[in-house]
Amino acid sequence: MDEKEFKRLLRVRARLKRKKPRFLRQEWWRYPKFKNDPKWRRPKGIDSKMRLKLKGKPRSPSIGWSSPRLVRGLHPSGYEEVLIHNVKELEKLDPKRQAARIAHTVGKKKRIEILKRAQELGIKVLNPQL
């Protein structure tokens, strides 16, 4: 796939994501236990209006809401995110396709080492703040 097509697919995905609703479980507004944990759960009730896809009821996820397969799961910049814990893991990355995200357990001293080495290798770091 050429660079131009890849950029186009990223733009298509961004446009789709803007229109995509939040898929929340049925009657999430009614119970406090659902408000604190707003995950999607398929409606299975025999009289469920949401399962029947009635007008005015919340939308359900379907294959039409998904992003193009070639850019699915990528960072908005187009890189594949890889979680990094040390400099050794950083050196395994491909700078053209992958970007590093430094794990939250990494301390300040090791983070500085990782950032220096990433700059030498030309690898993009997604969370470079100290």
Swiss-Prot record:
InterPro entries: Ribosomal_eL32 (IPR001515), Ribosomal_eL32_arc (IPR023654), Ribosomal_eL32_CS (IPR018263), Ribosomal_eL32_sf (IPR036351)
An annotated GO cellular component: cytosolic large ribosomal subunit
UniProt GO molecular function: structural constituent of ribosome
KW Nucleotide-binding (keyword) present: no
Presence of keyword Thylakoid: no
Family: Belongs to the eukaryotic ribosomal protein eL32 family.
Stated name of the protein: Large ribosomal subunit protein eL32
UniProt organism field: Pyrococcus abyssi (strain GE5 / Orsay)
Taxonomic classification: Archaea, Methanobacteriati, Methanobacteriota, Thermococci, Thermococcales
